[in-house]
Regions:
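Conserved N-terminal entry element of GNAT/NAT acetyltransferase domains
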Residues: 1-14
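Conserved GNAT-fold acetyl-CoA-binding loop/helix
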Residues: 17, 21-44
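A short helix-loop-beta-strand connector motif used in the catalytic cores of GNAT acetyltransferases and
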Residues: 44-56, 73-74, 90
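Conserved acyl-donor/pantetheine-binding loop and adjacent beta-alpha core of acyl/acetyltransferases
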Residues: 66-93, 101
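Conserved active-site alpha-helix within GNAT-family acetyltransferase domains
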Residues: 107, 119, 131-149, 156-157
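Conserved GNAT acetyl-CoA-binding A-motif
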Residues: 110, 117-129
Length: 165
């Protein structure tokens, strides 16, 4: 399946909540509760839509993947670790339906994020990931992101990643 990301609208909110809830339940079932185990609400999705641009990949009316890009630096990211990018975008969240994970959909979403960043125009994509069993650090490395630093957030190790576009 070739993924097509589109900007999420208010009509997508309930489907995005369902997707994020399924991903959260999957992570808890695999790794137990942790910093990654946060609930999702319509209010939270609408807030994400105000602070950034939420993209969604759908099958029919159901969200199967989503990611959020923003020009706003998340407060947990320390820019001293990153390069001299003049126009960074921040990947602030990404979820893929548990039944679609490990099938290339996440990589396709990041390829689309890279394309979107070039058109924005941005010169890099920055993100953080937990350095824990539930973290996606290895996935981001395999997709071409470069580790640029590490920090502790809420007593959990974070890895900062950057990709020049």
């Amino acid at each position: 399946m070739k993924v097509k990301l589109q900007i999420a609208t208010a009509e997508d909110v309930s489907s995005l909540v369902a997707l994020r809830t399924a991903v959260n339940a999957h992570l808890i079932a695999q790794y137990g509760k942790g910093h990654w185990a946060s609930g999702s609400t319509e209010k939270g999705v609408l807030f994400a839509m105000k602070r950034g641009t939420v993209y969604v990949a759908k099958e029919g009316q159901n969200a199967i993947a989503t990611l959020t890009l923003s020009t706003r630096k998340p407060w947990a990211i320390d820019t001293k670790y990153f390069g001299a990018s003049k126009r960074p975008l921040y990947l602030t969240s990404m979820e893929v339906s548990p039944d679609r994970q490990r099938k290339g959909l996440g990589r396709q979403c990041l390829d689309e994020a890279r394309r979107i960043a070039r058109e924005w125009p941005a010169d890099s994509i920055r993100l953080d990931a937990y350095d824990a069993a539930a973290g996606a650090g290895e996935f981001y490395r395999k997709c071409g992101f470069r580790e640029v630093g590490r920090a502790i957030y809420r007593n959990a190790p974070l890895i900062y990643f950057e990709m020049l576009v």
